UniProtKB/Swiss-Prot annotation:
Signal peptide start-end: none
Protein name: Large ribosomal subunit protein bL17
Name of the encoding gene: rplQ
Keywords attached to this entry: Ribonucleoprotein, Ribosomal protein
GO molecular function per UniProt: structural constituent of ribosome
Family: Belongs to the bacterial ribosomal protein bL17 family.
Domain of life, per lineage: Bacteria
Species per Swiss-Prot/TrEMBL record: Bacillus velezensis (strain DSM 23117 / BGSC 10A6 / LMG 26770 / FZB42)
PROSITE patterns: RIBOSOMAL_L17
Recorded GO CC terms: cytosolic large ribosomal subunit
GO biological process, one term: translation
Cross-referenced NCBIfam families: L17
Alphabetized Pfam families for the sequence: Ribosomal_L17
Subunit structure: Part of the 50S ribosomal subunit. Contacts protein L32.
Length: 120
């Protein structure tokens, strides 16, 4: 299995990817470094595929990974509910390729290449 280390221990890396995945599901567009965006893409694609499956086991697998954060204040919807009700239905006909990565310029502080990752 090939993945990027991202300069972190395995637990730190998993926690960071869980946070970024939850943020992308809630906001549908985030700005991060290019390598984080490329690593995040595979995780988010798997979560959306679980959402499209829609059965109880898929929901429990996604719930084990996605953080329990409120996605929508008006209807009190959390990130998991948004994944299964809004995002999964949007990509029902699409076979993969749910995200887009657009490169930005370098970050001002340290010159790290930045990118925007968003749901298509």
């Amino acid at each position: 299995m090939s993945y990027r280390k991202l300069g972190r221990t395995s637990s730190q890396r998993k926690a960071m990817l869980r946070d970024l995945t939850t943020d992308l599901i809630i906001n549908e567009r985030i700005e991060t470094t290019e390598t984080r965006a490329k690593e995040l893409r595979s995780v988010v694609e798997k979560m959306i595929t679980l959402g499209k499956r829609g059965d109880l086991h898929a929901r429990r697998q996604a719930a084990a990974y996605i953080r329990n954060e409120v996605a929508n204040e008006e209807n009190n919807q959390d990130a998991l509910q948004k994944l299964f009700s809004d995002i999964a239905t949007r990509y029902e006909e699409r076979q993969g390729g749910y995200t887009r990565i657009m490169k930005l310029g370098p970050r001002r502080g340290d010159g790290a290449p930045m990118a925007i990752i968003e749901l298509v």
